[in-house]
């Protein structure tokens, strides 16, 4: 047999291909056949010969020792023992040598008929159920009807055993003697053999042609999609089969491989028992059944017994390959399913994620961390005990060098004695050797940083306080891991790239991350705060030295207000305090004098300025200085937290009284029937929310005044050291409203209802038992949420990393001319993110000029710095076009100019930066933070008070657009009621240029309080409305008539128990034909119909006279929700996964006028007709939804017709890719912004780019794509480019080409001229048609699985599915992303591991000059990109350089 030739595994490869293994392949890799199911001998504990652990097949158990012991020691290496047949070699070969089992009958591989899509089923055109009947020996299948065709037998028909024998009985007797290729012969088989024969007989090319024809001509969508699915599998095999690497019949196996025994070990436990890997059990079952089947075949057992045994063999092999796919999986002794080969790959504990993507490493240790305030920013304290252990090999080398010991063994003993010499050597060894510190969970790249170790006597690692925010570390028992970089390159990278003092900026938003907090901030705040009537107040000083002198001599107090000549040399006097002067001594000289109280908010910009104007080195010194000052001053200030510092304001009682009265009033209105229960509830909640806010204002005012603003609790909160306004409110104000306990925590997000009686006490007064009980619920919800949501955030991060891991910066400029327009982000006219913030650090697409002076502000392809951004913001420019990764046209990854500035360094991003992973980490890291935010405030509910007015933000003149109003008179007099949906009020500048200052959309049903053309002042109220109810108004005067409003069918009468007031509330009716409506009949006989949605409360009775503008029905808006990131994280996930929302809005696809059609099955038809009447689209909107449009309204494409969220796929199909990108970006940013988290847009853009990378083929043209294929946009473009200037043969004439073949212009000319010479007609051709695709939006999970790298996809999710699909395609992974390379054990192709740097030769300049002189070159250096120039060194020279380099 052709097996046993050992293959050494190459480590230096640049791609990995996965394909089906042929039986020959399996035999070639095998070292022998496993014949017996035995494992080891129970007496000698040695492997049984020919068994699953056989030494003859897999190699010796002990190094260089054969089974019988005839040959021992290394000198017999390579000899095969003549007694036991074992090769004398290393025992490590037992980890790499494979065996095999030859099966008596072919067995079908479970992956290819149990995973979806069913590969074998698609190829043969069989249903999965039918296929399984054949495979598991229930039915015969007809492979060739032959003479049985006259009996009505067809190909692929299933036959029971009786039918099979019946047919054999009826056809010719010599059927069995005929050859298989004789068309007369009737062939029907069963089991794996049948499937194998059918796969062998397949003609893939012919099948592909038939299927392509069917796809082109098929009218039924269902049949067409079925044909496409089949075609997909057929094409996969055809592509892979061009070089004979994949044959369909290899999905049926005649030999199965046995993996090396060390990978499925038998481990002796104490007590004489053995623990074994599940695989051994599974293999044993296969071998036992296979041997039994062999024996049965040999003794010619009856067919029934054989068939049963064959089926059992098939099942045994199935279990071995994938036990979890089987319904009746094989279970072990403890009744758990055994882990099969597939399970070894899958999931977190599988091969990919456990051993390939993450490994445990040598030279590492972990210990508890403590604060090290005496350290410098780039240092960490390392316990001596740990250091000795970590640097042991280095110490041993030094000991031997110094001649203290002779051998490594004695050196080890010497080190363990821990003598003086050892400590001396250790001090020397760690000089210039950084260590890496890591804290789990490592949520972003700052979770691992490099430090210079300082040896300490304790057993805990000491951490600099300023790196805590980056690690999110505290000292309540956190542990950290230490790693030692070994090679010179690793040390260099650690020092240059990873040193903590070089990582002060956050990669997420570019702001400083090493910001003092807690004690340090308290000290800085204390030292820079002013106090009246202090010693030396009002003194004037000429310079800083004088102030220092006076303070040191106790002439002036720390908080005294003094005057100082401005150090900038302008000679002006500035009002400041002594403390601020002392703080400014720590600032670098280049910075302006900082004259403000330093709270967390104010310190951050100061650090940012220092960073910008100096650099990392000086910033680190500055940070160390303010750290020391902060700690010292907070200690000497004597700030403490005491009960007497909590003040309860006197006004609290009054405010609560007032609130109680208002609530009482609402209750009365309700009992009189003026308002609904819902309105009452909303009013009560609002009252308490407002009261709570007032109490906390009063409380803070009192604290501010107390001790002249030096109240410790106020100081701690105001400086941002500890505690929040919210927490102090609960200490001294009132705890406020609580969330209502609800069953469905975490479902659908929202925080749910709020209890309407608040907790009036605070923690200083103490809570009553009832109040305490109510408040426990919120606190527990917080803790439960934390636990559940952390996992979600972690999973989100994992998916983000997976989708964007392969995005690196691959070139400087991709040369695109496109960009995206960005302006300031506004929310109801309030600027959320100004223009300058959104364009800083990006690159402009074209030159930008000042519109007034026409001077150039920024050139095309130039980086917009802070200064340029401010210049642009000063002008009247509203938006500017910038380069973006969304429009970047780089083949792989993105280019420098489209990405812009690297936020972590403040410089342009370098080629090789792995921006994808940074983006994923920047988005995922706060996700975890956000989830942990809920419980600090103990679950107290906060809610926004609903908006109910429009106030003018500017003074100006009013203009109306699309605003329809009607005058309506009620008991309070006449009022203007708005009847339009999209009506706008604009405030125009009163000056000459009449530009629009701002515009407001006025909601339907609002009362308009101003007239067109009126002048308004800032703060005037323009309109007001009911914030608790949506209204339905009548637009004409007339009489009310009800239609389909039937008691207990379409409405129920709700009687309020307390008030006796009755209301008609519309309910969803069982009968779909009924559509409740209120009809208003006008005097001239016109009828206006108003549909009543579910939950509408009708305000009029049948026969009432109504006037235009009167309310017909109210719909309560949703009860107030608490806003909490619990809703936020699922929202982020929903957007990134591009999910359709639960209740999506129906969206208009065209601009046009709305009209209503019929009502069918509980839905209203809405028709949109374009203005020119050419196009008409009709939509069905469920009647339970609230309509946002009315008859005659004008809508634009993308406008909603009813309420609900717009599905991103709708935006893509209606408004195009740019709009959906903007939608996703803004929606996700909004969630983070609500939580006060700053993340730069470019990070979201990187992820959105990956979501939109693929297109769906709508017209395959003359390419090999199939309709509905999802392919990479770049791939489609390059294949279409290849088709340019090519032709498709329609009639080949006599040339050697096929119909439908694609040929180039040149070949066509040559063939035609040949035909001309022979006087034959020319070839008839047509131009080749390119493929057409439409952009696709994929969720991040789908996008990750759709990558070109199968290794990355397989290690992400759905491992078996990815591997089966790749195997039949014989896919090659080019190892371009980061993940694939980690799996393959290569350095990643980013940063210093880029492929371009692989072949560079490193040497000194002098060596290069010597070389050139030797070669006789002209002294020119080789060109920079590693390509050989004129004077390029030869290979021998290169080797010399490398040798000398390594000596240095």
Swiss-Prot record:
GO terms for molecular function: DNA binding; DNA-directed RNA polymerase activity; magnesium ion binding; zinc ion binding. GO terms for cellular component: DNA-directed RNA polymerase complex. One of its GO terms (biological process) is DNA-templated transcription. Binds 1 Mg(2+) ion per subunit. Binds 2 Zn(2+) ions per subunit. Its EC number is 2.7.7.6. It is an enzyme of class 2 (transferase). Zn(2+) 2 binds at residues 814, 888, 895, 898. It catalyses: RNA(n) + a ribonucleoside 5'-triphosphate = RNA(n+1) + diphosphate. The keyword Transcription regulation does not apply. Keywords: DNA-directed RNA polymerase, Magnesium, Metal-binding, Nucleotidyltransferase, Transcription, Transferase, Zinc. Its cofactor is Mg(2+); Zn(2+). InterPro entries: DNA-dir_RpoC_beta_prime (IPR045867), DNA-dir_RpoC_beta_prime_bact (IPR012754), RNA_pol_asu (IPR000722), RNA_pol_N (IPR006592), RNA_pol_Rpb1_1 (IPR007080), RNA_pol_Rpb1_3 (IPR007066), RNA_pol_Rpb1_3_sf (IPR042102), RNA_pol_Rpb1_4 (IPR007083). Disulfide bonds: none annotated. The keyword Plastid does not apply. It comes from the Bacteria. Residues 1408-1448 are annotated as: Disordered. Mg(2+) binds at residues 474, 476, 478. Zn(2+) 1 binds at residues 66, 68, 81, 84. Belongs to the RNA polymerase beta' chain family. The RNAP catalytic core consists of 2 alpha, 1 beta, 1 beta' and 1 omega subunit. When a sigma factor is associated with the core the holoenzyme is formed, which can initiate transcription. HAMAP family: RNApol_bact_RpoC. PANTHER family: DNA-DIRECTED RNA POLYMERASE, DNA-DIRECTED RNA POLYMERASE SUBUNIT BETA. DNA-dependent RNA polymerase catalyzes the transcription of DNA into RNA using the four ribonucleoside triphosphates as substrates. This is DNA-directed RNA polymerase subunit beta'. It comes from Salinibacter ruber (strain DSM 13855 / M31). The gene is rpoC.
